[in-house]
């Protein structure tokens, strides 16, 4: 099954592909891991998070909520390229939102003992002393808190959230939510004069149980409120009474992936999907934008702009999600709500009304020119950390900051992060590879092996691994463009159907227009270690299984690269198998004509404590074989991501079962500096390396199909290879 695509040009694709006059763009300039904010002597292995984020009036300090630790965290961004930890302040509960109010910080804190007996407080912290100076009882569980632009009051969305384990999470579930309005004087709340605003009886869905979710205030002092599970929006006037309210409505979606089946298939339809908005931001005194995340029965994979009278001005209808697909960030494992657009932000940068839309599951931020609210223009998509929850714009400093909530260190993965972006003249650094511009939408991800066209410089092919087990695919890449372009996708087939039980980790040319593919086996999932010969259409023409000698000693970590030298296929085995000495892995040789096997041993670097070392690619160019050797560590724990070379003359395989010769290796390049070039954290899986016909080296990382990953794919050339 083969898909050939004619390249077209979209506004976003044109802006990133062709040389244009320099314009103002956002690029990431710093990353701050939340464990850095823990004090000396604290258990830094504890779960930490960065959820909702805001900035001081001068834009020099960020505050974020960290609910697992029950604190708010502070970050000094006086130098935005070098954020500094300012520590945390305990809240005596679960902080939900924090805002600066002059030299104070006001924080919504959830203190509920149960869903049926919710409670919470509005806490005020004096920044000079870092002490709590006031607390207001809110009478329920707070979610979002907003501060009026003039600093005169705050409004709190008291959600009194539902218990999802009761009646399958259906509402109504008492008690009902409401809104609290509290005046501020010198940053201190006037608790005695707080106003409780009833929003029952408004929604069509469970009107007796409003579930306020997100709240924002415009320059006129009007409050806009999303009630997510109720699929309703409420506008409260400056006098504290309901001025208007309306259903958030529904969206029809076409060309979406509707099944979680290990394949990217954008041909489905979803009709009448409730928006169920989460985040909301006023654009001006008449319009606001919403992110239609969904939480109960909806989630329309879109964002919208409404007038405050309920008139729909703009509906994205999945356009941002399609752009996310082109970037390789579509989270196939979360299909119901797709990319799950969570929150929004708005600010005016140098006279340009600019909207930001955050995708929680795709871990990206869409940047829009909202000069005409009826016709937003997508300008960029920025990479963020894993599961961005909150975002704050600082237009006076040309900065943007995101709070990324998921901490995966318990699984050996990345911590939660705050990321800082700067708006400056230049070109977008990300994406580095995209399928934008094709006639039909090409979804992709988990690029795990790379090979160059033997004749055309800059032309490459890559394979996807078992994340997309139902549609293993070979991608054609044009790396002469910037960003590199995926121009075609060929599904690997067996007997006319997408081949099953493959985990493609290596690809090499067969010299006849087809490819040899290396599949990493996993016996506990019935996936065999094997080699596959496919033609240009992706049809499997031959399969080579492991011989008994190797099957007897195989383990999970198998083939991670393949290269062809004459009639011999060479494969890198990622980690030691049962018969390998510690620190030695096999480079396996298979003679295609003689149908015989042999091997040599490759010496691995010594891993740090708690880490393992392995190979993740093998390619041949000139008189050398090149491998990627890496540890399995990520972020600040990553220590080894390197390219080594072995002289082909030394690749003299011995028979299996005999003592294997040990080859000598030479370091070619340390990839760690390349992996932080975009000012993010170091990803663990550097998986593909190829040298093109002009001798240029290309590297690609595996984004794990955006599963427990930010989805970032780094693709770059470091120039001529020695």
Where are these regions (language model features)?
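Sequence/structural signature of beta-propeller domains
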Residues: 23-722
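Gram-negative bacterial Sec-dependent N-terminal signal peptides
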Residues: 1-22
């Amino acid at each position: 099954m083969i898909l050939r695509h004619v390249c077209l040009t979209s506004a976003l694709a044109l802006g990133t592909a062709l040389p244009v006059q320099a314009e103002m763009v956002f690029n990431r300039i710093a990353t701050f891991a939340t464990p850095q904010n823990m004090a000396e002597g604290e258990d830094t292995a504890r779960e930490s998070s960065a959820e909702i984020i805001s900035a001081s009036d001068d834009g020099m300090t960020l505050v974020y909520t960290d609910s697992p630790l029950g604190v708010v965290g502070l970050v000094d961004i006086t130098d935005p390229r070098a954020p500094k930890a300012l520590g945390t302040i305990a809240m005596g509960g679960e902080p939900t939102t924090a805002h600066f109010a002059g030299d104070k910080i006001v924080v919504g804190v959830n203190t509920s003992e149960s869903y049926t007996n919710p409670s919470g407080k509005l806490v005020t912290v004096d920044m000079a002393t870092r002490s709590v100076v006031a607390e207001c009882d809110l009478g329920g569980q707070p979610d979002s808190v907003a501060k009026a632009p003039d600093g005169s009051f705050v409004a709190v969305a008291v959600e009194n959230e539902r218990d999802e384990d009761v009646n399958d999470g259906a509402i109504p579930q008492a008690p009902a939510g409401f809104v609290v309005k509290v005046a501020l004087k010198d940053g201190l709340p006037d608790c005695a004069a707080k106003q409780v605003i009833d929003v029952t009886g408004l929604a069509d869905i469970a009107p007796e149980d409003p579930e306020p979710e997100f709240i924002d205030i415009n320059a006129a002092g009007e409050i806009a409120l999303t009630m997510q599970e109720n699929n309703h929006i409420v506008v409260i006037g400056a006098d504290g009474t309901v001025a208007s309210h309306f259903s958030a409505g529904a969206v029809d979606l076409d060309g979406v992936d509707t099944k979680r089946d290990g394949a990217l298939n954008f041909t489905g339809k979803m009709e009448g999907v409730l928006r169920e908005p989460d985040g909301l931001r006023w654009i001006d005194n008449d319009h606001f934008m919403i992110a239609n995340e969904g939480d109960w029965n909806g989630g329309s994979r879109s964002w919208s702009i409404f007038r405050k009278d309920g008139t729909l001005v703009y509906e994205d209808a999945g356009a941002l999600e399609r752009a996310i697909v082109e970037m390789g960030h579509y989270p196939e494992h979360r299909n119901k709500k797709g990319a799950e657009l969570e929150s929004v932000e708005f600010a005016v940068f140098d006279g340009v009304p600019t909207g930001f839309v955050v995708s929680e599951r795709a871990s990206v931020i869409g940047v829009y020119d909202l000069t005409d609210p009826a016709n937003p223009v997508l300008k960029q998509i920025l990479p963020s950390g894993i599961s961005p929850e909150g975002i704050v714009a600082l237009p006076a400093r040309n900065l943007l900051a995101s709070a990324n909530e998921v901490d995966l260190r318990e699984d050996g993965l990345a911590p939660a992060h705050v990321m800082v972006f700067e708006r400056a003249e230049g070109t977008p650094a990300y994406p580095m590879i995209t399928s934008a511009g094709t006639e039909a939408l090409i979804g992709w991800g988990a690029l795990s092996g790379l090979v160059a066209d033997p004749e055309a410089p800059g032309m490459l092919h890559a394979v996807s691994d078992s994340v997309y087990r139902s549609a293993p695919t070979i991608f054609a890449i044009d790396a002469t463009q910037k960003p590199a372009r995926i121009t075609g996708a060929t599904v690997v087939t067996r007997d006319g159907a997408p081949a099953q039980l493959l985990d493609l980790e290596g690809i090499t040319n067969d010299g006849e227009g087809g490819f040899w593919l290396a599949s990493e086996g996993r016996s506990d999932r019935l996936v065999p270690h094997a080699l596959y010969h496919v033609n240009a259409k992706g049809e499997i023409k031959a399969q080579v299984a492991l011989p008994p000698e190797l099957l007897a000693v195989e383990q999970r970590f198998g083939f991670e690269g393949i290269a062809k030298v004459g009639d011999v296929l060479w494969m890198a085995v990622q980690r030691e198998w049962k018969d390998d000495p510690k620190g030695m892995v096999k480079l396996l040789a298979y003679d295609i004509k003689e149908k015989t096997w042999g091997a040599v041993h490759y010496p691995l670097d010594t891993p740090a404590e708690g880490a393992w070392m392995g190979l993740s690619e093998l390619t041949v160019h000139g008189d050398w074989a090149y491998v990627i050797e890496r540890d399995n560590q990520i972020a600040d724990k990553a220590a080894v991501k390197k390219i080594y070379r072995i002289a082909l003359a030394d690749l003299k395989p011995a028979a299996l079962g005999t003592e294997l010769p040990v080859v000598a290796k030479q370091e070619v390049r340390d990839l760690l500096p390349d992996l932080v070039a975009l000012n993010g954290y170091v990803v663990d899986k550097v998986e593909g390396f190829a040298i093109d016909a002009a001798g240029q080296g290309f590297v690609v990382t595996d984004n794990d199909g955006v599963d427990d990953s930010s989805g970032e794919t780094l693709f770059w050339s470091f120039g001529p290879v020695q």
